[in-house]
Amino acid sequence: MTTDKFLFSIIVPTYDRPQKLALCLASFVKLEYPGDRFQVIVVNDSTEISIETAVSPFQKQLNLELLSQPNSGPATARNTGAFAAKGKFLVFTDDDCTVAPDWLQTLETRFAETPDCLVGGRTINALPDNVYSTASQQLIDYLYSYYNAIGDRAQFFTSNNFALPAAAFQNIGGFDTSFSLAAGEDREFCDRWLHSGRRAIYAPEVTVYHFHELTLRKFWRQQFNYGRGAFLFQQTISKRAENAKKIQHPSFYLNLLIYPFSQKSGIQMLLIAALFVLSQTAIAAGILREKKNSSPN
């Protein structure tokens, strides 16, 4: 249900990261935008872990609503928040992100020009000294350079920084909740959005900062889960369109592997290049795991 009161509803799914959530909410307080024109909906993806301590200091500073659900994954959490939202436009970010002060203002400018589009912004790694976090973001940057090379004909956004009309979100059914991991659900949503005949626009001036601390083990797990999500994504789009592309052209992978050399120099560049190779191994392992699990015994 939308109202004339709020132009934007910011949806933040969260799971057991109260300190990061507090930083995220603090960045909303600093937005250079009228406080009575947006609301914040935090969806706690757990009924067992309380986040009241992190949220309560912001209750009087923001139009903030806290919802809780049994642990079901970020896709379901985003839907829970979106279907309770009252704003004309939904804006999604994650609990480990902070937003630029002009975040909503830049979105308003974009929607004034293209009110029916999905608008995706730029994500900046906020932990440049963490090589695993840097590699993870550079992998996303490469995908953006590939899929969003033509800004007004974009194809893919991560769900930590995109916005769209609330009515259109509900019309296409929200996120696919069969994606239980934080992997593939945003890719599937973008594909379904485009498949419905709608348009997506890349707006790099719409900026968030990502504080995702990774270790080697966490990096592997993240990429492994991306592989699991990629398998489910391919299964899903195959049902949607018989001629759906299942394998990228070899040049996609070649350009991916050389991409780090265009971004950094020195030792970190070599480490990131090695992590790019490792990521493809982890993704392949995740795909094989899901393929095995989906095969009849």
Identify what each model region corresponds to.
Residues M1-K30:
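N-proximal low-complexity "stem/linker" segments adjacent to membrane-targeting elements
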Residues L25-S68:
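Acidic donor-binding segment of Leloir-type glycosyltransferases
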Residues T53, Q69-A85:
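Glycine-rich, basic loop-to-helix element that forms the pyrophosphate-binding segment
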Residues L90:
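Short aromatic/hydrophobic "clamp" motif used to bind/position activated sugar donors
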Residues T98, Q155, Q170-L194, R198-Y202, ...:
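Donor nucleotide-sugar recognition loop
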Residues D102-S133:
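Conserved donor NDP-sugar-binding/catalytic core segment of glycosyltransferases
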Residues N125, S145-A167, S180-A182, E188:
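A recurrent flexible, glycine/aromatic-enriched loop bordering the glycosyltransferase active site
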